[in-house]
Amino acid sequence: MSASLVRPLRASGLLFAVLACAAAAQASSFDCGKAASRSEKAICADPYTAGLDSQLGQAWSATLAKAKDPKALRLDQRQWLKERDQCEGDLACLRGRYRSRLIELRYINVPFNWQATWQRVSVSPFYAGELVTRRTGQEHLTFDLSAAGGANSGALQGKALIKGDEASYALDDCNLRFSRRNGLLEVTQEGDASACGAGNGVYYSGRYVPSGQALDSHYDLLATALVRTEEEDQRARKLLQKDYQTLLDSGSVFSQETSAELKGAEATDMWLQGLATTNAAIFVRGTKGELWVALLAVAGSSDEVRVRYYTTEPEWKHSLPDVVQHWYEARSKGQQLALDMMP
């Protein structure tokens, strides 16, 4: 049995390229001896995530010191802590919350203006979104929205009615609410993707920061928590070489699997929504950081879809563990995809 989990995440490369290497070495911003919730205990047990917490503590203090409305900002932070704690022990969820919040804090003190271009905060490049708002008179707001969900996309234009710190839009079964959150804009959607003019799995909800350009993306295996440490990430880069990026391009949806042969290993089936026949992979991490990876690759002038298999373990270089074999058979679907055993 597998449990699917969609992870709408993306990070800012400008911020994390500078800070990521130091994350694992930093302690959390709170006393781990007093950690009470599952999320706090998970943070304290994982040095990389604890480092993100430390960075957030510093960014929070600096942002609060410059806030024009400290009370509103504290309320917002308390709400964020509630959302963080909903992750419980899920490291991918926790890392995504922290990375997203670090981006938000960079923009949260920017003076709010309905006349702006906005980018959706997301750790994954597969869930980017852009919103352009223009105020037309005292009570109306025109908007132009676009968003991605895996390889699918959506776009919507309309006119919303402004009341105080919110604007609302309703047409048939599509309802949007635009809410001011300090210097940010929060979009809430009611109605499914098709009702709002979008492809399968595409939604406009989320927090948007004022920026005329797309947020720099620094999406890696650490962001997804497929690897735990910088050392493991470097091992994966060395093993996969150019296919490290192929692996990242293989997943907007993640599903957990189990292996009878690799006791205690974490196996993650991943695929790109809308392009699962060409963009998919399985990533297996052993209890000591061993790696087994199989991924789809489009090769040659005929765009043949092949499977490339990598592992750090010499004894597995020429055979597939059970969970990888099952993935390979499922992806082949009777057509027997060519299998390349990579060195």
Q: Whereabouts are the PLM-identified features?
A:
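Bacterial N-terminal signal peptides that target proteins for export
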Residues: S2-L14
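Amphipathic, heptad-repeat alpha-helical segments
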Residues: D31, S39, I43-A72
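Contiguous, well-ordered beta-strand patches that form the walls/edges
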Residues: K82, A147-L185, F283
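Tryptophan-anchored aromatic micro-motifs
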Residues: V110-L131, L171, Y204-R235
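Short, surface-exposed coil-to-beta transition loops
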Residues: P125-L131, N152-Q157, L171-N175, V202, ...
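N-terminal glycine/threonine-rich, aromatic-flanked beta-hairpin/loop signature
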Residues: F126-I162, D233-A260, A265-T268
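A short, surface-exposed interaction/processing loop segment used at functional sites
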Residues: A195-G197, Y204-S205, R285-S332
